[in-house]
């Protein structure tokens, strides 16, 4: 499993580049969430930490650490 760290940059399997800006907790479930920003567009997203290192279609990681 790869490192998940604030400030690190990752490539999504569909090609976009994102930077992790925070690790948060869901207000109802306490589930850890990754808060990340699209480097090019500036959009901010959140995704459960449990999904970050998932293997998706074609057997590739959802996100790959690039920096």
Where are the model-predicted features located?
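Basic/aromatic-rich interaction segments and small domains that mediate binding to polyanionic partners
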Residues: 24-49
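Intrinsically disordered, low-complexity, charged/polar segments
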Residues: 43-67
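Short low-complexity stretches enriched in small and charged residues
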Residues: 1-2, 19
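Short coil-to-beta transition motif at edge beta-strands of beta-rich domains
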Residues: 2-13
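Residues in well-ordered beta-strands of folded domains
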Residues: 21, 37, 64
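Short connector loops at helix/strand junctions that flank enzyme active sites
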Residues: 13-15, 31
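Short beta-strand-centered aromatic/proline hotspots
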Residues: 16-25
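Compositionally biased, intrinsically disordered low-complexity regions
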Residues: 9, 17, 60-61
């Amino acid at each position: 499993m790869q490192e998940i760290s604030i400030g690190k940059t990752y490539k999504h399997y569909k090609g976009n580049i994102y930077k992790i800006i925070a690790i948060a907790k869901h207000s109802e479930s306490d589930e850890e969430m990754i808060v990340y920003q699209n480097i090019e567009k500036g959009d901010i997203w959140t995704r459960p930490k449990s999904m970050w290192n998932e293997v998706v279609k074609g057997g590739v990681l959802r996100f790959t650490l690039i920096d």
